[in-house]
């Protein structure tokens, strides 16, 4: 329903803003080092095109996303089921 879509769009936009604010203060979500917080959150952000919010509107979140997207293990995991998949860029 339109109500449900709008509700969850607002929630997702709020989460983007909170993540962006956090990443303004630190390189990664839990501080200066790459941790399970980043590992668990990145796959959700990798679907940013589905969220229809515009990751490029969040400078710090975009930086974090792109930095993690370049990690060899992340690329390998992203392509695990389909070698032709390309990690979406903002």
Task: Give the label of every model feature segment.
Residues 74-90:
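Terminal-tail/helix-coil boundary detector
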Residues 1-72, 77:
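GST-like fold's C-terminal all-alpha helical module
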């Amino acid at each position: 329903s339109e109500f449900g879509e709008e509700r969850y769009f607002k929630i997702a936009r709020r989460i983007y803003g909170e993540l962006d604010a956090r990443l303004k203060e630190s390189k990664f979500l839990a501080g200066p080092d790459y941790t399970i917080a980043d590992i668990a959150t990145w796959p959700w952000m990798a679907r940013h095109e589905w969220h229809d919010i515009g990751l490029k509107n969040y400078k710090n979140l975009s930086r974090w996303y792109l930095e993690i997207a370049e990690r060899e293990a992340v690329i390998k995991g992203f392509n695990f089921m389909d070698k032709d998949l390309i990690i979406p860029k903002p």
